[in-house]
């Protein structure tokens, strides 16, 4: 798999003298090669990447934000229901992503048998709190109370024991500098 301006297929073509066979397209490629050639293949792919001198590729790693919100005041059931009218989501019609640029971590709780999930309570500048959940979260999602963060999320409705609450499906969280 690839991302950004790096073409996986072009990288495979740059190593065509090392591989047995291969092919693909810009976003993904596959190869067959001898086990003893794995190191050579890895070096060639890295050399090819370096030769491109790509810059600012990090922008492709962050979720795109369809809407920036200043606070959580409009994150409610009505918003979630209106967003649901845009379904079905999928390729060509991605689910909208919201971004709050400044929020404080009020609490953090590890969940799951191995603590692999995280639940963050984020407070906006007006004191409103929204619970955010991420399943199989990377370690950088486990922020400490008091941390100031930017968060990318998708609003959802959680129904538990007959109680409906709006929360966020946390896609990414970054510590503010």
What are the functions of these language-model segments?
Residues 1-177:
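Acidic, two-metal ion nucleic-acid-processing modules in DNA metabolism proteins
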């Amino acid at each position: 798999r690839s991302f950004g301006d790096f073409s996986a297929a072009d990288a495979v073509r740059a190593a065509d003298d090392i591989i047995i066979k291969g092919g693909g397209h810009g976003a993904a490629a596959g190869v067959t090669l001898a086990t003893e050639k794995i190191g050579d293949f890895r070096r060639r792919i890295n050399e090819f990447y370096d030769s491109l001198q790509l810059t600012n590729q990090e922008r492709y790693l962050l979720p795109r934000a369809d809407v920036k919100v200043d606070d959580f005041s409009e994150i409610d059931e009505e918003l979630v229901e209106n967003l649901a009218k845009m379904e079905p989501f999928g390729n060509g019609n991605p689910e909208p992503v919201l971004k709050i640029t400044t929020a404080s971590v009020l609490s953090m709780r590890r969940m799951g048998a191995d603590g692999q999930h995280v639940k963050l309570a984020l407070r906006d500048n007006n004191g409103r709190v929204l619970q955010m959940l991420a399943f199989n979260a990377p370690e950088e999602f486990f922020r400490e109370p008091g941390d100031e963060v930017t968060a990318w999320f998708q609003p959802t409705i959680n129904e538990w024991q007959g109680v409906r609450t709006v929360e966020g499906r946390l896609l990414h969280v970054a510590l503010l500098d």
